[in-house]
UniProtKB/Swiss-Prot annotation:
This is Cyanate hydratase. The keyword Lyase applies. It comes from Escherichia coli O157:H7. The keyword Lyase applies. Pfam families: Cyanate_lyase, CYNS_N. Homodecamer composed of five homodimers. CDD domains: Cyanase_C. The active site is at residues 96, 99, 122.
Amino acid sequence: MIQSQINRNIRLDLADAILLSKAKKDLSFAEIADGTGLAEAFVTAALLGQQALPADAARQVGAKLDLDEDAILLLQMIPLRGCIDDRIPTDPTMYRFYEMLQVYGTTLKALVHEKFGDGIISAINFKLDVKKVADPEGGERAVITLDGKYLPTKPF
């Protein structure tokens, strides 16, 4: 039976334990996700407490990380999503995303509405990908793809 969580702390505690096991085993998120049939970003989100894994994937991930049965069950439960503290992020990487939305949020909104009409981009029917590419000017660049289904506003 599908179960739901009402408290974010249990998944945050599990995420801490998962990250410790990941570090001890020297595994990447890609290695943990391998064989689950799910995207690296989705599995990572589940490991960090923001998604629920199907039972088979939870068992595969649990075996790689030596998680107990309770932890494997928790990975399958629908989490309390979006539970980052209600404040401006202080972590530099997360702050840059916040800053990007501060600078480009109105631009994204205007372009989405111009191209699609009144509506939203789903974070439920959604795909996320992060790639590292060479910068022709030297160094590296991050290419982040946010792929969400457009859901039009429906008058009623």
